[in-house]
Amino acid sequence: MDYGMISQIEKARLYAEEPERITFKTLNSTFRGDNNTYVISLDESGWHCTCPGFQSHHICPHIMTIERLLKPMLKIAPVPYAPGQNVVSDVKKMHRYAEEIDRIVFNSFQVSIQGNNSDHSVGYDQGTWTCDSNSFRLRGVSSHTIAMERLLKGMLREQVAT
């Protein structure tokens, strides 16, 4: 019996129950909206979406949905409503989209996780995980990557493809 792995699974459960330990640094996702499929990203300059609503108002129901789903893990202020934005329609869409997570696929992201002993960097890119923890270097998996898999269940590229 691999007691080290059992410990990693238990830590992952605890980390997933405390999503405020996690900070998204960057992300790239595909979002299947009602009319088209869009690419949403977050980087040091802020949010971006390829939808027409974002191009005109710098906010859209796609970003609002991601903000809602990842709220405790985003350490930035939500994008404010914009003049001319159809707020009622966008909020309704956001609520519906948040219940339909099969619309969202995370292609890549970079997060920082406050571990029990130190902070760790976790990356995900098209199904490939990276983590700077010793357990990841030894096993190719860690409590940090398992926690992210739990939190983003059904929205990761390899989970959607299978």
What is each of the regions a protein language model found here?
Residues 1-162:
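Long, low-complexity, compositionally biased intrinsically disordered regions
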